Structure formats: C-alpha cells, structure tokens
C-alpha cells in the first residue's frame, strides 16, 4: 500500500553525515508527576486505569515497536511513578528533571535504541496504528525527523501519534542543544534549526480520521474531565475514539 503523501513544508536535507535508520525501534515515554498544570497526571485514573497504563498498554499493540521505555525525573515524588511501573514490569529509567533531553538520551542508551519514537505520557488515547504508519513513513523516506502527533501541516487529530528520529540524531541534539528551552523541550533544536533537517509528516489515509480539530491529549484539568466523562476504554480503536469525540 502506498504511503500517504507528505505535507511537510521542511524539505531541505540534513547537512552532515546521513543518520542511520537501523537498530531497535523503541518508544520512549516522557512521564512525570510534577506537572504544574495537572499534578500527578500520569497516575490519575480514567475508567479505573492509571493514565500511564493507558499509554503503555496501547503502545504495546504497535507491531513496529521493539520495546517501550518510560523516562521519569529522578525526584522523590516521581519515585512513586517508578515503583508503579516496576510493579507492572514496564522498563523505566530515571534522569534529570529539568534537562529532559539528557533524560531522553539516557533512556535511549539504556534501551539500546536505534530509532526512537518519542511519546508524551499525556496522550492516553495514543493509537498503535498511528505509530506503525509513522515508523513506515520514516523508514521509507529520507527523513531526519517525522511526526504525526499534532496537526501541524497534516490532518491528524491531536494526541493519536508520536515523533520519530534516529538515535544518531538524538545524540547530535544532545551535543549541540545549548539553550534552556532546547534542553527542556527535547526536540526543539530540530524546529529551531528546521532548514538544516528534512522534516516529514503525512495525512491519515481514511477520511473519517482526518480530524485535526480533535484534541485528544490530557494537558490540563479540563482535558482530564472531558476524557473522564467519555465512554472510553484502553483497548478502544481509532474509529470508535473519533466517533465518541466526533
């Protein structure tokens, strides 16, 4: 089946050594309990299931992933989250709270990732199908970085997808990113220097999935309340999710 047409406006090739697209594909989930906008959000429950379990459970259905690693801050508060993940047998690692890029790289090294899929822990409705399509799109194109987690130059709902880049590029970002914003928001260096990278995205194939106005993530308390009031469950497929939020 042909891949959806790229809609990226960023098409300049990365200047430097081509990034290898080999090795294990690892989803790294950035999770924490210290959010100021929605404290403890990773352990808040939707339908009696903690949000972090929604994310890891739904990611486990992705055929293109070789593993999952959760990256949490090394704070006393987040030790509760680490213990929760360890009890469930979910691989996890603790790193710097403020230097998220360093923590992300630590997780990639710990998991021996070759390609890294970045996932936000506030996306409880993340869809395995979106992850698989993203990996295929990235592998079959000449992209340095690709994404479908937000409706930027594409028609995806907000919160179903992710971002992907090579471990080589991630290590390069770690070496070059000097601004505080680039360390805290770990892939900002790419967007700050977009002319130096080939950035790709694509549309969903299905008309019913082309819903960029839908917000499915859980960033604030009102997002949590909206999700909590919907008849959703952790194994729900994308068509039913779109129908419920329609």
List the predicted regions and their residue ranges.
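A short, N-terminal amphipathic alpha-helix
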Residues: 51-68, 87-88
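Short phosphate-binding loop-to-helix
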Residues: 74-139
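Conserved core of the sugar-phosphate nucleotidyltransferase
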Residues: 88, 126-213, 244-246
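N-terminal nucleotide-binding beta1-loop-alpha1 segment
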Residues: 19-38
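Hydrophobic helical membrane-anchoring modules
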Residues: 15, 20, 215-246
